[in-house]
UniProtKB/Swiss-Prot annotation:
Origin species: Shewanella amazonensis (strain ATCC BAA-1098 / SB2B)
Keywords: Nucleotide-binding
Taxonomy, superkingdom: Bacteria
NCBIfam families (alphabetical): PRK05412.1 (NF003819)
GO molecular function: nucleotide binding
Identification of the protein by name: Nucleotide-binding protein Sama_2557
Disulphide linkage map: none
Length: 161
């Protein structure tokens, strides 16, 4: 019986490359000349620091552009609304979601069941296993997951025939 797993993962290497490219682009930008800033990456969290909150927002936009160039889906990005002001600098955290959260998994399973395609879906930790009799049914579910607006990017792996 064919099956596959729906997962939501961000490639840490590509993310690190995007952070490095962001740092390089900011070194060359005229509006960041003479400005004290930093871009740090640790444990799937990017910390952006700058002298003004406007520059922090610009840094988020630059990071988004670099993620797009590296084929990392920006839906996995979770930007803190609050910019923290500490003395001389402003800081903003950007977290990246790994795995499918429980409530998103339940919504996706409900979406799969409402589609009336003859497949079974079950939650397995931070992924969803989808099993069906026909490969075409599984491909229809893949398309459904890609087009769903659940605020998280989905990848498919472990395809068994």
């Amino acid at each position: 019986m064919p099956s596959f797993d729906i997962v939501s993962e961000v490639d840490a290497v590509e993310l690190k490359n995007a952070v490095e490219n962001t740092r390089r682009e900011m070194d060359g930008r005229f509006d960041f000349r003479g400005v004290e800033y930093s871009v740090d990456f640790k444990d799937m969290v990017v910390i952006l620091r700058s002298e003004s909150d406007f520059q922090c927002r610009q840094m988020v936009d630059i990071l988004r552009g670099q993620l797009a160039k590296r084929n990392v889906d920006a839906k996995a990005m979770e930007v803190d609304d609050k910019i923290v002001h500490t003395g001389k600098t402003f800081a903003q955290n950007v977290k990246f979601k790994q795995g499918i959260e429980q409530d998103v998994a339940k919504k996706l399973i409900k979406l799969i069941k409402d589609s009336k395609v003859k497949v079974q879906a079950q939650i397995q930790g931070d992924s969803i296993r989808v099993t069906g009799k026909k490969r075409d049914d599984l491909q229809a579910i893949m398309q459904l997951a890609r087009t769903s607006e659940l605020g998280q990017p989905f990848q498919f792996n472990n395809f068994r025939d």
